[in-house]
């Protein structure tokens, strides 16, 4: 089983947490790809681009992915499994939701079944409608504004902007997320999100002449 493959010989609470998270993320990602009825190569590639799987575990992960992608049914249970590991709206949960959005849009516009899937997962994770709309804006085909990426209004003052950016950069830093239980396999996804946050802040500061 995937659980035994990932689990260390003497699991500690943090290691057990990382195993549970990894298994649930693979299942949620596979079922996300199946949400609109068809799993495309683009969706599989999107998962592999954001999640680093060690060569020794590729076959095991592949078998579990193939099993999970047979049907989107049961995704709520995996979402609840992840949600129990963290406080509501935790940065790690936002990273996971961002990954699911990335998979959903990888083969074109986000479809209605995919949107329903994402909405349900977001609710289980504790995110409200405003949170969801902010994350959705990041994945629209026309691209988000730098303010949408940071989750602030365009009239925010310079001092508050800098404070908010520093908070985001700290909470979404891979080291912070790893300490909170995110497995190292997902560092690539975390780095991608952090790069977007920093790039958005750079754009705004240049626009404002800061």
Roles of regions detected by a PLM:
Residues 1-34, 38-210:
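Small-residue-enriched hydrophobic alpha-helices in membranes
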